[in-house]
């Protein structure tokens, strides 16, 4: 580029910076240096973290989780919240369905005393609350459950049989246009849970679609389709569900990968079961007949006994998981970045100690 053009560009950049602030325009290499690598928050499922390619869900992005009823959508989001809290982060749950069970959330591992919960009356109120929470910059995860329950105010105030074509789609489109910038700036992971509906008269292809129009499909960096495969039984007693998640869209890594795991009633995702399955697949756990062994020591006969052994010995479970992550992802367990409040607390403590 010649000197005159460089001067003209420099003057334009200076004017933009003066009017819109520092960092309004920057060279892509500088932007990458400022933002660094995309941080992730674990999903609570080792297999799903691997399928996502970056060890979890990306911070500063929109994620959609959809599937049929009782497929494990809310359970998965509660695990995401629990993982963020374990790493010192904070989370909020916008419960538009008014169906969140605090006892189950606690059983899954969520610190309910540290979880912000909102049960809004209208879709506009729900999305406005989500926007304000994201803009605060103090949260790591915001979950909206669910898009289908975000009822526009006009529909709530109208008569039961009134037609309100496209209201919800317009609401979602407007909200996502407003939210996207603040989500990226605050580095908050925003998860939308969605339901499935059937399109009428579809001859070819899948008749399934998600609610709320197409905006969420476009704005989401990751979309996950979660399905119940079958029941986990011990004799006649049903203990939980076998679940499959397909990553149908992924802007962070190659898409269309799948993960299978067990969701146990009253407990959530069976992490020990995943560690055993993936440990065997990666060669860290030996399986001979019904016996499972690790480092030459037998850890149980049958998967249930091996799972119980890992529950009783969390350090061994953590060691196997760390080795699996190191081999498959080349990383350790992902951590959520501390919030601004947590960072200031740490600085104050270090100041007192010095």
UniProtKB/Swiss-Prot annotation:
PROSITE patterns: RECA_1 (PS00321), RECA_2 (PS50162), RECA_3 (PS50163)
Disordered: region residues: 329-354
SMART domains per UniProt: AAA (SM00382)
SUPFAM superfamilies: P-loop containing nucleoside triphosphate hydrolases, RecA protein, C-terminal domain
Binding, ATP: 67-74
Keyword set includes Endoplasmic reticulum: no
Localisation: Cytoplasm
GO cellular component: cytosol
Function as written in the Swiss-Prot or TrEMBL entry: Can catalyze the hydrolysis of ATP in the presence of single-stranded DNA, the ATP-dependent uptake of single-stranded DNA by duplex DNA, and the ATP-dependent hybridization of homologous single-stranded DNAs. It interacts with LexA causing its activation and leading to its autocatalytic cleavage.
Family: Belongs to the RecA family.
NCBIfam families assigned: tigrfam_recA (TIGR02012)
Cited HAMAP family: RecA (MF_00268)
Protein name (database record): Protein RecA
Organism encoding this protein: Halorhodospira halophila (strain DSM 244 / SL1)
